[in-house]
A protein has these predicted regions:
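Amphipathic, Lys/Arg-enriched alpha-helical "gate/interface" segment within cytosolic domains
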Residues: 1-132
């Protein structure tokens, strides 16, 4: 399942791998994040606890600061469905867009979050998780 919003934000799911992929590119607006939050809620509603999220922000230039509440909604939807881990790809730490701070409020200590600078490292981490 794949849904793309304005070519800036996309949400995909691979149920067989128990994986949700959230990608953002370019300049992302509040409206795009709001639409993505709704799509995340739809995609994860039938997921069993223990799935993984890959958040790919390699091509993100900027995100409206007013989108923070909708980022929180995405995190709450994932936490509510008992996501096991969130693996992020953020090549430039200056483009973190406050995800680490938001995570502290929306994810409990039982949700593992880890950030990588490269997609290759993130995929390696996901591969190691699936081997466990």
């Amino acid at each position: 399942m794949r849904m793309t919003f304005g070519n800036m934000y996309s949400v995909e799911a691979d149920r067989s791998k128990r994986l949700v992929v959230i990608s953002a590119a370019g300049r992302v607006s509040k409206e795009e994040v709001k639409a993505a939050a709704q799509e995340v809620r739809e995609i994860v509603k039938d997921f069993e606890p223990g799935f993984t999220v890959l958040a790919d922000f390699r091509w993100l230039d900027s995100m409206d600061s007013s989108s923070a509440p909708h980022i929180g909604e995405i995190m709450d939807a994932l936490a509510g469905k008992k996501v096991a881990s969130v693996v992020r790809v953020i090549p430039d730490p200056h483009k973190d867009i406050g995800l680490n701070i938001l995570s502290q409020f929306h994810y409990g200590p039982e949700i593992r979050t880890i950030t990588f600078e490269t997609l290759a490292d993130a995929l390696q981490s996901l591969s190691e998780e699936s081997d466990e």
